[in-house]
Amino acid sequence: MEFQAVVMAVGGGSRMTDLTSSIPKPLLPVGNKPLIWYPLNLLERVGFEEVIVVTTKDVQKALCAEFKMKLKPDIVCIPDEADMGTADSLRHIYPKLKTDVLVLGCDLITDVALHEVVDLFRAYDASLAMLMRKGQESTEPVPGQKGKKKTVEQRDFIGVDSTGKRLLFMANEADLDEELVIKGSILQKHPRIHFQTGLVDAHLYCLKKYVVDFLMENKSITSIRSELIPYLVRKQFSSASSQQRQEDKEEDLKKKEPKSLDIYSFIKKDNTLTLAPYDACWNAFRRDKWEDLSRSQVRCYVHIMKEGLCSRVSTLGLYMEANRQVPKLLSVLCPEESMIHPSAQIANKHLIGADSLIGSDTQVGEKSSIKRSVIGSSCVIRDRVTVTNCLLMNSVTVEEGSSIHGSVICNNAVVEAGAEIRDCLIGSGQRIEAKAKRMNEVIVGNDQLMEI
């Protein structure tokens, strides 16, 4: 077994709490499938037979009840009261980890050729290989956000070599001063560094086993994304003398605080790179000289996805966009599944757009039009209803003559006759009165947070 796959499904979706207050983030429906289905399906498509899923008890119950995949999940629950980051979660399952690991977030939806990342990891004997994509901004409005001050996303500064594959620098702008400081040892080997600020971390990482060993002893690191990866990137091209000094101090360090141990303390001597002459020539051709590979034991690489679908569903806007994009992806991933479930009862199928999904046991009345939308299971949509660019979750009722545009309607909500809803988020179990006109509102229960 070359890799053990781990899916992180712990985060509560702090940036989309109006949705996740009633539905755990890994179970949010995207294209009528739970969000966590997408990384699990990605693993299954490339031949993984087992996966470790780190999650909560609520998600575990749902997965055990509804899991219909060939992939065998080993579900590990974290304590309910625990506030665990991704690095903490890896430590929690450390006894199960025997090989290099492939870590994915539960909110990743992508059609990436996974071998592109894995091949980098193998070819360069990397400590880390990760997936990034070019940032994409949706032009569609986000439900309930008109007039609100848009949160300014802090950018990552990413530096790569001339091949675009070796990851030489990575830092969030919040952690930077007015100047970028680059280590001289990096500039000696890579005098030209290409910087980009429009890349987004997809939360897909290949990690050497010794990196996980290092994490186990360095409990101050809580996040893979914001702490471990910048640390590994900084540790590249450490001079031989500094490595030797580290080795000389290793015994003393062990006697003191284990958390202070350097990554080089965990790299096995028998893990040093040994390549056949052909491989050495091949790597030299790829502009990573044999000398560089053999001397620099910590190596970080990145595959930057330029085409295809790659989205992390971390905000309400990205959640809406994922539901708009996913019908095309599902037609490839699940060609045997109909866009309209066979059990759905549709009065006028020609009024259902080819870019829409209709779930099981849903009823759609006479002269009702559904375009560019995802409709869940057991919904009731009466006559002369218009639904455009929307997501309706399960068991939603829309009465006669209503119009809904650009909105999310959560489970068991009711929209009474003649209502007009535009760019709204309607929470679980909410009722919109007849002939109401609602625009750019967030309508949730008193027990649900009002933050998006």
From Swiss-Prot:
Domain of life from the UniProt record: Eukaryota
Q: Name one Pfam family in it.
A: NTP_transferase
Keywords, in A-Z order: Acetylation, Cytoplasm, Initiation factor, Phosphoprotein, Protein biosynthesis
By its UniProt entry, which InterPro entries does this protein fall under? eIF2B_gamma, NTP_transferase_dom, Nucleotide-diphossugar_trans
* Family indicated by similarity: Belongs to the eIF-2B gamma/epsilon subunits family.
What broad class describes the main subcellular location of this protein?
A: cytoplasm
Q: Where in the cell is it found?
A: Cytoplasm, Cytosol
Q: What is this protein called?
A: Translation initiation factor eIF2B subunit gamma
N-acetylmethionine: modified positions:
1
Q: What does this protein do?
A: Acts as a component of the translation initiation factor 2B (eIF2B) complex, which catalyzes the exchange of GDP for GTP on the eukaryotic initiation factor 2 (eIF2) complex gamma subunit. Its guanine nucleotide exchange factor activity is repressed when bound to eIF2 complex phosphorylated on the alpha subunit, thereby limiting the amount of methionyl-initiator methionine tRNA available to the ribosome and consequently global translation is repressed.
Q: A GO term (biological process) for this protein?
A: response to peptide hormone
Question: Where does tissue-level expression of this protein occur?
Answer: Brain, heart, liver, muscle and testis.
One Gene Ontology MF term: guanyl-nucleotide exchange factor activity
Q: Which CDD domains match?
A: eIF-2B_gamma_N, LbH_eIF2B_gamma_C
Modulation of this protein's activity: Activated by the chemical integrated stress response (ISR) inhibitor ISRIB which stimulates guanine nucleotide exchange factor activity for both phosphorylated and unphosphorylated eIF2.
Q: Which residues carry this modification: Phosphoserine?
A: 260
